Amino acid sequence: MKRIFLLIATNLAVLLVASIVMSILGVNTSTMGGLLVFAAIFGFGGAFISLAISKWMAKKTMGCEVITTPRDSTERWLLETVARQAQQAGIKMPEVAIYQSPEMNAFATGPSKDNSLVAVSTGLLYGMSQDEVEGVLAHEVSHVANGDMVTLTLIQGVVNTFVIFAARVVAGIINNFVSSNDEEGEGLGMFAYMAVVFVLDMLFGILASIIVAYFSRIREYRADEGAARLAGKHKMIAALERLRQGPESSAMPAQMSAFGINGKRSMAELMMSHPPLEKRIAALQTR
C-alpha cells in the first residue's frame, strides 16, 4: 500500500511540477504543439538526468567501492584486465569497482564512453575462474564501447515522450467525449482527468517497457559479440555457462540490471532486458 501511495504521489507531483514549469515557460499544453514540447522536455529530460547521475546513483545504490590502489593480487588483476580491454576497445579507462553481493553479476554505467564505471560483485569476482571473469569484464567494456548507455537513454527518451504525449491526448479525447454528453459540458473535472492520465501513463508505460526491453536484448547480443572479440569466444561462453548454473539474478536495481551481465528471468520474454542465457550461448556458438 505504501509503495502504491508513493507511486501515485510521485506521479501527481511530476504532473504538478511539469504544469508549473510549462506555465513559467509560457508553453500552452492545450495545443498539440505545446503538448509535444511538454512531453519531449520531460520525456528526454528525465532520461538524460538519469544518465548524468548514473555513476553516482550506482555507487550509492549498490555500495560500490571504487578501486584506486589495489589491496591484493585479485584487485590488481581486475584493474589490469579492464585497462587492457579498454585500450583494445579504444575507450578511456573506466572506473573499476567492487560491490558486496553473493550474486554473480556485474554492470557498466556512466554518461559517456570516457566517463564510465565497471563494477563486479564479490560473488562473481571470487566465485568464477579468471577466464570467466575476463569474459564478463569484456562484456561490460563492450557495453561502454558500443555507447549502449547513451543509445538506451535516447530510446527511453523517445518512449517517455510517447507515453506522456499519448496519455494526455487520449485523456483529452475522453474528456471531450464526456463533456459532449454532459448537459453542463464540464467534462471529467480536474481530479478525474488526472486519474485518467495516471492510468493511461501506466498502460502506455507497459508498452514502452516492452519496446525498451527489445532494444536492450539486441544490445546484449552485441555486447556478447564484443566480449568474444576482446577476451575470446570460449571465455564468454564459459562465463554464460557458469551464470546459467547459478541462481537467478534479483538484487540489482533496474537501471543497473539493463547493463548487467545476468538479467532477471521472466515468463514473458518480451519484458526481459536480457535474452535467455541459452539463446546468448547459442548465438555465440554459431558465430
From Swiss-Prot:
Family recorded in the similarity comment: Belongs to the peptidase M48B family.
Protein's membrane topology: Multi-pass membrane protein
Keywords: Cell inner membrane, Cell membrane, Hydrolase, Membrane, Metal-binding, Metalloprotease, Protease, Transmembrane, Transmembrane helix, Zinc
Record-level Gene Ontology MF annotations: metalloendopeptidase activity; zinc ion binding
The UniProt record lists the keyword Transmembrane helix: yes
EC number: 3.4.24.-
The organism of origin for this protein: Shewanella sp. (strain MR-4)
CDD domains: M48B_HtpX_like
Top-rank lineage group of the source organism: Bacteria
Cofactor requirements of the protein: Zn(2+)
Pfam families, A to Z: Peptidase_M48
Name of this protein: Protease HtpX
Compartments it resides in: Cell inner membrane
Free-text cofactor note: Binds 1 zinc ion per subunit.
Active site: 140
GO BP, sorted A to Z: proteolysis
Residues annotated for Zn(2+) binding in this entry: 139, 143, 220
Predominant subcellular localization, coarse grouping: membrane
Keyword Zinc listed: yes
TM regions (residue ranges): 4-24, 33-53, 154-174, 195-215
Annotated Gene Ontology cellular component terms: plasma membrane
InterPro entries on file: HtpX_protease, Pept_M48_protease_HtpX, Peptidase_M48
Gene3D superfamilies noted in UniProt: Metalloproteases ('zincins'), catalytic domain (3.30.2010.10)
